[in-house]
Amino acid sequence: MKPQIDVIHGDITTMHVDVIVNAANPSLMGGGGVDGAIHRAAGPQLLEACKTVRQQQGECPPGHAVITLAGDLPAKAVIHAVGPIWHGGDRHEASILEEAYRNCLRLAADNGYKTMAFPAISTGVYGYPKAAAATIAVDTVYRYLSLKPMPEKVTFVCFDEETLHLYQRLLTQRGQELEI
């Protein structure tokens, strides 16, 4: 069965999906960009849940992901993924970013979630080149969904038009029919 992957331009905090992915930092305590937006929209319960995870597991290293409740968000849960900081590509950034996406997909499936939304992990303050990050994201999600039944649908939520067009082009090359 062909994977169900879509892309939209919008605000990930308003997505009515089972789980949204947060591009988190290792502390899980919120920050700038999408991380800060998710924490603000979710309310104080999300920060408390992240504090509990930190107390139990410590910091979340790059490539890893953890799951928490969603607080005031319309989603059921939030998966916090820590992507790599871009250092020019010679510090295994690509494999770390791929691992982050894979771990998110695995956590969603393991928890029975059928629909999920991703931001463009590591492309904000972490400086990962958008085109390279989009290619890794699409390839990783496509490969995973081609082999596994869950999650059933993944949506990439793009903050800007440039990123949206990158994802649209990549998904079209993969033969995805996009709702535009």
From Swiss-Prot:
Any one GO MF annotation of this record: ribonuclease inhibitor activity
Signal peptide: none
Sites where the protein binds substrate: 11-12, 25, 33-35, 122-126
Catalytic class of the enzyme: hydrolase
Top-level taxonomic group: Bacteria
Active site: 35 (proton acceptor)
Disulfide cross-links: none
Domain Macro per the UniProt entry, residue ranges: 1-175
PROSITE patterns: MACRO
The protein's assembly and partners: Homodimer. Interacts with RNase III.
PANTHER family found in the cross-reference section: GANGLIOSIDE INDUCED DIFFERENTIATION ASSOCIATED PROTEIN 2-RELATED, MACRO DOMAIN-CONTAINING PROTEIN
Its job: Deacetylates O-acetyl-ADP ribose to yield ADP-ribose and free acetate. Down-regulates ribonuclease 3 (RNase III) activity. Acts by interacting directly with the region of the ribonuclease that is required for dimerization/activation.
Name of protein: O-acetyl-ADP-ribose deacetylase
Originating species: Enterobacter cloacae subsp. cloacae (strain ATCC 13047 / DSM 30054 / NBRC 13535 / NCTC 10005 / WDCM 00083 / NCDC 279-56)
